[in-house]
Amino acid sequence: MSANDRPATGQPTATYESAFLKACRREPVPHTPVWFMRQAGRSLPEYLKVREGIPMLESCMRPELVAEITLQPVRRHNVDAAIYFSDIVVPLKAIGIDLDIKPGVGPVVEKPIRTRADLAQLRDLTPEDVSYVTEAIKLLTAELGETPLIGFAGAPFTLASYLVEGGPSKNHEHTKALMYGDPQLWADLLDRLAEITSAFLKVQIEAGASAVQLFDSWVGALAPADYRRSVMPASTKVFQAVESYGVPRIHFGVGTGELLGLMGEAGADVVGVDWRVPLDEAARRVGTGKALQGNLDPAVLFSTTEAVETKTREVLDAAAGLEGHVFNLGHGVPPTTDPDALTRLVEYVHTQTAR
């Protein structure tokens, strides 16, 4: 049973009545809940201290370290949810893909997947492959109490892009070439990745995660017709795989203004919106029955407190008519952000939206 489910007795579990989960369920909230993508990361001096000398992938596999890093922004900023500290390529590493995260570059895959024979590299993910995730989440839920923990994974398209390109890419030429040139191989690749991603999310939910977010970082590179035909079936498969757990499912990608409706249609309960589309317009594109998450421009955090508050007020005003709203940035926290700016932002949103 997940931390979001009501037990058979009808009594809610610790996180069920949290502002974050209520907003995800489009229920009335005491205040607009706030959390930040990449809230556990390089913007925090305490993060830099505990990560010193430890490679990224190794840090994702040490349960006590993962728990500490995940908790840091909750302690410092009073955010309404924690997000599990990991990286989207962790499940790929766990099944034996030869990859590393290079500082200043990102994930680099030694042998890109571009042929049918290459698909053999993608075996099933088992809970034993990521036992450190289960252990870390057990530690976290014991510490977090009533604060929900968000589990996450990379969406099939974004994982495929890393695997096919061999690393980060601006234009995704190899990825699109495979998608257009060999549609059946592409579909089989995404289907395998959907199975791996689903298994990774199930491990997190069964360990105690209260919600999950599917990050499709690169999907904004696609036209809507290509998304619907070549990507959406795999994302839908992931959302359907975890539907029975009853936890909110969040879907986010960057530059996805033209895809918002389809991303909701794929099976998300909450659609994340970047800073380019006002939330009232995003709601029109997504349609009814979905909560929205977002969408302050992260760059404003480098401006004055007054500017941050003005832009935040614009986001809150645009969200005023929404059924459910989780406040977030429109992308991850930039590494050089002043952490005090984030603490002030959380306090401002809580104060301004107190019911």
Curated annotation (Swiss-Prot):
- Provide the alphabetized UniProt keywords: Cytoplasm, Decarboxylase, Lyase, Porphyrin biosynthesis
Chief location category: cytoplasm
On whether Repeat is a keyword of this UniProt record, the answer is no
Source organism's superkingdom? Answer: Bacteria
| One Gene Ontology MF term | uroporphyrinogen decarboxylase activity
Q: Which reaction does it catalyse?
A: uroporphyrinogen III + 4 H(+) = coproporphyrinogen III + 4 CO2
Site residues (Transition state stabilizer), renumbered to this chain: D87
For the ligand (substrate), the binding residues are R38, Q39, A40, G41, R42, D87, Y162, S217, H331
Q: Name one GO biological process term.
A: protoporphyrinogen IX biosynthetic process
> Where does the record place it?
Cytoplasm
Annotated EC:
4.1.1.37
Spans through the membrane: none
Signal peptide positions (record) = none
Pathway(s) the chain acts in: Porphyrin-containing compound metabolism; protoporphyrin-IX biosynthesis; coproporphyrinogen-III from 5-aminolevulinate: step 4/4
CDD domains in the record: URO-D
GO cellular component terms?
cytosol
Supply the Pfam families for this chain: URO-D
Q: Which HAMAP family match?
A: URO_D
Oligomeric state and interaction partners are given as: Homodimer.
**Annotated family:** Belongs to the uroporphyrinogen decarboxylase family.
What this chain does, per the record?
A: Catalyzes the decarboxylation of four acetate groups of uroporphyrinogen-III to yield coproporphyrinogen-III.
Q: What is this protein called?
A: Uroporphyrinogen decarboxylase
Name the species this protein comes from.
Answer: Streptomyces avermitilis (strain ATCC 31267 / DSM 46492 / JCM 5070 / NBRC 14893 / NCIMB 12804 / NRRL 8165 / MA-4680)
